[in-house]
């Protein structure tokens, strides 16, 4: 499968030091690649870039890891077979 993991774009992936969500996304990418999947990390705060990457990436699965971007879920849904949204922040 071709999988997109969408990060918040706050810090790089993998992070230099602390970055729990960023490290989790990195770990997911490594494990999924080891299982034979093609994985792309999209890590930008620019929602237009995210929409562009997903629209033209032809992904089977898109996993959004930042609930602040929830308003673009409807834009992403037509461009993948499965759309997953997770929140990792204790608001």
Show which residues each predicted segment covers.
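Catalytic cores of nucleotide-sugar-dependent glycosyltransferases that transfer UDP/GDP/TDP-activated
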Residues: 1-91
């Amino acid at each position: 499968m071709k999988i997109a993991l969408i990060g918040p774009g706050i810090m790089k992936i993998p992070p230099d030091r602390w970055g729990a969500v960023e490290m989790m996304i990195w770990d997911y990418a490594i494990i999924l690649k080891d299982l034979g999947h093609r994985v792309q990390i999209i890590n930008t705060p620019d929602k237009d870039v995210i929409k562009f990457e997903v629209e033209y990436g032809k992904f089977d699965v898109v996993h959004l890891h930042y609930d602040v971007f929830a308003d673009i879920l409807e834009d992403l849904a037509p461009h993948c077979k499965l759309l997953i949204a997770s929140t990792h922040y204790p608001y």
